[in-house]
C-alpha cells in the first residue's frame, strides 16, 4: 500500500521482529501457565494481518474505538487474543447511528494533523489528536477486556 504522506519508509523487518518477540514471550509464559490470557492490538487495515509473522494470530476480534466512547474518531482495530476466551465485542460503527458522528461523520480523524472533510483538508486545530490519544485505548474498551479476564479467572477456579 502506498503511503503518500509518509515521512519515513516502512521497516517491515523491524515490525516483524516485534511481533516475533511478542509471540515468543506469549509462548514462554504459556508454557508456564497453559491458561494464560493474552491480547495483541493493531489497526485492522494494517499490513500485519496479511504477513507470515501473524499467521498464528488467528483468534481475533474487530472493533471500532468510537463504539467504546473513545475520543471521537472511529479507529477500526483488530485485537488478537488467546484461544481460551470468548469475546463478542460491540457491533462495528454505523455512522448513521454512532453517537460520535455529526451528519454521518466522526467529529475527529485518527491522526495527528487536521483531517479531510468532503475531500478537502480542514484547517481546524480541533481535528488534531496527540500521539498519547492515538495510542490509548478507550476506557470502556479497557474495562471490557478486564471483565473478560476476570470472567475467565472465575471459570478456571
Spell out what each predicted region is.
Residues 1-157:
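Conserved active-site and SAM-binding loop architecture
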Amino acid at each position: 500500500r502506498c503511503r503518500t504522506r509518509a515521512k519515513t519508509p516502512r521497516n517491515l523487518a523491524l515490525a516483524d521482529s516485534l511481533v516475533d518477540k511478542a509471540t515468543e514471550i506469549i509462548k514462554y509464559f504459556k508454557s508456564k501457565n497453559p491458561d494464560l490470557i493474552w491480547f495483541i492490538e493493531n489497526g485492522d487495515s494494517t499490513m500485519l494481518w496479511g504477513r507470515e509473522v501473524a499467521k498464528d494470530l488467528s483468534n481475533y476480534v474487530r472493533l471500532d474505538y468510537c463504539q467504546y466512547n473513545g475520543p471521537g474518531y472511529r479507529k477500526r482495530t483488530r485485537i488478537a487474543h488467546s484461544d481460551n476466551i470468548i469475546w463478542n465485542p460491540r457491533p462495528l460503527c454505523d455512522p448513521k447511528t454512532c453517537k460520535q458522528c455529526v451528519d454521518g461523520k466522526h467529529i475527529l480523524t485518527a491522526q495527528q494533523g487536521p483531517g479531510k472533510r468532503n475531500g478537502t483538508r480542514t484547517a481546524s486545530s480541533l481535528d488534531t489528536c496527540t500521539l498519547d490519544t492515538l495510542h490509548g485505548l478507550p476506557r470502556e474498551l479497557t474495562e471490557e477486556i478486564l471483565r473478560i479476564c476476570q470472567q475467565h479467572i472465575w471459570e478456571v477456579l
